[in-house]
Amino acid sequence: MSKPVITRFAPSPTGYLHIGGARTALFNWLYAKHCGGKMLLRIEDTDRERSTEAATAAILDGLTWLGLDWDGEAISQFERAPRHREVAEELVANGKAYYCYASPEELEEMREKARAEGRPPRYDGRWRDRDPSEAPAGVKPVIRIKAPRDGETVVHDAVQGDVRFPNKDLDDFIILRSDGTPTYMHAVVVDDHDMGVTHIIRGGDHLTNAARQTIIYNAMGWDVPQMSHISLIHGADGAKLSKRHGALGVDAYRAMGYLPAALRNYLVRLGWSHGDDEIMSTEQMIEWFDVKDINKGAARFDFQKLEAINGLYMRSSDDQALFDALVAVLPEIEGGKELAEALDDKGRAQLLLAMPGLKERAKTLVELADGAKFIFASRPLALDEKAASLLNDEGRAVLKPVYPVLEAVGEWTAESLDAAIRAHAEAEGLKLGKIAQPLRAALTGRATSPGVFDVLVVLGREESLARIGDQIG
């Protein structure tokens, strides 16, 4: 019987959860779910100078917001240092690693010699077979792995295929420093083995590490997990992803008003696809996702595509769910604090009532919040440039007779208001747009908004008439 699939996401807490890391987490999560397995979380916090608790919290928060739940407690790599030392010492005892007493001066000499000979710098193995009794007094050694010198190390990769590394290029690298702390290369292998990880899905920049890690697995006689190294994300112009392309933290995407489900949908298609399907539910992603279908080539990040997908998700969202998502993100978006303060019971009811019209015109929650500002605007309304041009003398003249028409409407519903304005337009020989445009400007201070009859209903009779009255004098 085959082992249950266990994947892991192993970020370093030196900053936010960036978009590449979020995609890696998503792929690990989906594959674990697809196989009925588990995704574990390990915080690779061995770099004590750069690792921070705030960064760890930001990563956990980002994963939670994205809906990527992990199994069990998050594991701290730093706290496992005694186990890493134990395995390094075991490798020495078994003749698979050795103590190296080479001084910094000797190592620099090796580097200089390699440079002079046009070779990449490599440790020359001078302590590989020496008797430790020859060790200089008072020098704390490092532990180096005894890497094979002949042949090649092959990484069997589900995405990249078999990748071969000549062993002459892989020197006896350090697994334990002289202060007793493990190197990243060593700690990762010990942790993945002890956690029972069966499948490693990570960025292609780790492919060279995979060769060295395979050497440690083989030295310990452990099974090597199935590796999948995914190509990095590039910008739309094909260059390496940078902040201008979208290499931001997940928290930034949240503050820009993207929905987690939409971001998941966009990220899953960066390097993986299922036929021509663009929009897919989480259940479909889980059913369809397989590492063998991940593309070798680099994916390109496209903000416009993300916006389009987010807009689709917003339009298909339940009004209450979208309202809740907006309220949750208000503290983080520009102008959101003022909007949040205006949300008393009446304001909440108005915003929910406006949601069907607002979501049709917004691609992000930020745009949704901006579109909703008219509800809470103070009188007299500040007019934007286009609204002011619509409320010129001609616009006000068109609007003046509309006031008594609206005042006389019995039932304040979109249908009744529509019928009354259309009848007035017909009687005056005007097209509906000729009335709707200055009316919208008077009600919202803008030239664009949800449907003008929906706006009248959301504002209510009293506020609507008052705003029109402000403009016609």
UniProtKB/Swiss-Prot annotation:
Motif range ('KMSKS' region): 240-244
Domain of life from the UniProt record: Bacteria
InterPro entries reported in the protein's UniProt record: aa-tRNA-synth_I_cd-bd, aa-tRNA-synth_I_codon-bd_sub2, aa-tRNA-synth_I_CS, aa_tRNA-synth_I_cd-bd_sf, Glu-tRNA-ligase_bac/mito, Glu/Gln-tRNA-synth, Glu/Gln-tRNA-synth_Ib_cat-dom, GluQ/Sye
Gene Ontology process terms (BP): glutamyl-tRNA aminoacylation
Family assignment from sequence similarity: Belongs to the class-I aminoacyl-tRNA synthetase family. Glutamate--tRNA ligase type 1 subfamily.
Protein name per UniProt: Glutamate--tRNA ligase 2
Comp. bias regions, Basic and acidic residues: 113-133
